[in-house]
Each structure stands twice: as structure tokens, then as C-alpha cells.
């Protein structure tokens, strides 16, 4: 939001200026950052962002006009990941550094969605966003190795989940047992129904290089 941008940068209209008709005009020139500690461009790119019930992930990437479906020029895109990629493009001259921080930008954004078809579109939107930015930078399409690395991040960071239970949809959430009796012991010997086994979501912390649960990710983000 504009308030978050103002808190981080100490000024308004860093990326774009909204018009009365709710359209926007992107700012021109290289975006500068405050000199205060942990407010540099590296910190901005690494800052984690989560879009809940993300649908097609319009807050992460804005590849197209939601009303018309027309593809937007890169300069007109204002999604959270779009902004990070703009910063990377403006602040890196070396191609290897561009790739390093582009990858980190993708590693920093997360989203979950209940509906599988919407999730598929969201993942495609992020992957195509990478293709767009790569082509804009180098004038050619990315090779298979770069695509595989970005795709691996996307399938980890955008996942299917029921936000109420924090489990895979249609899986039964675990019940809180107060007592444990003989009947419980007998039922434990039965083959469980796969639909009754809770499946908690596992994510990946790319900086710590470890897998963790969704609740652990939220706890770490609040610290």
C-alpha cells in the first residue's frame, strides 16, 4: 500500500502516481533509497511479501489489465514483484548480479490459493513475468536452466491451501484429543483414509535453506 511505501522510503509516489480515474502514471528515473540501515535496495528486494487467497496473483504481478486482458508494458506494472524487479533492473549493471537478485526477488514473494485452476494461472503469471523481464533486459528469451530455477521457486512459493485450516484443501484438519482410550489404540491399527489424514503445507525458507510449515513462516515474518 501507499502507506507502507511512505514508511519505507519517507516519501510518496515512489513507483507511481495514482490519478482520479484510478489509473496511474509510473515514475521516471532510477528510484533512490534512504541511507538508513536496513532500508537499502537489497533489503527491499529481500523483504518477504505474502498475498493471501491470491487468485491469479494480481497484487504480486500485474502483467495484464484485469478488465480487458491486454498485456501491460513492463513500465506500467505495479505488482509487488514487479516493483522489486524494477529495482533490480535499475540497481544492477552486471548480468550475474541481475540474475542473483532477480532470483532473490522471486524467492521473497509468497501466495496461497484454494482453487487449483486459479493457482495454475497465478504460477503462469509469475513465470511469464520472469520471461518478460529477461527479454527486456537481454533481448532474448531465458534458457531452460534459468526457467527451471525460477519455476522451482514459484511452485514452492505459490501453493494450494485452505486458509482456515492451513492444510491442503479437502483434507480433514486434525482434531484435538482430550482423552486417549482403548478404542483409540485399536483405530490406530486401521489403515487411515487418505482424506482424513491432515496434510499441512510445507514451504521453503530460501535464505535459511530449509523447509518449514506455513505457521513457522508467519512466525518468522513477525519477528
Where are these regions (language model features)?
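Serine/threonine-rich low-complexity intrinsically disordered regions
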Residues: 10, 17-21, 40, 92, ...
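Conserved S-adenosyl-L-methionine
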Residues: 17-166
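Short, small-residue-biased leader/transition segments that mark boundaries at the very start
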Residues: 2-5
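Feature captures the FAD/FMN-dependent oxidoreductase FAD-binding
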Residues: 12-13, 166-168
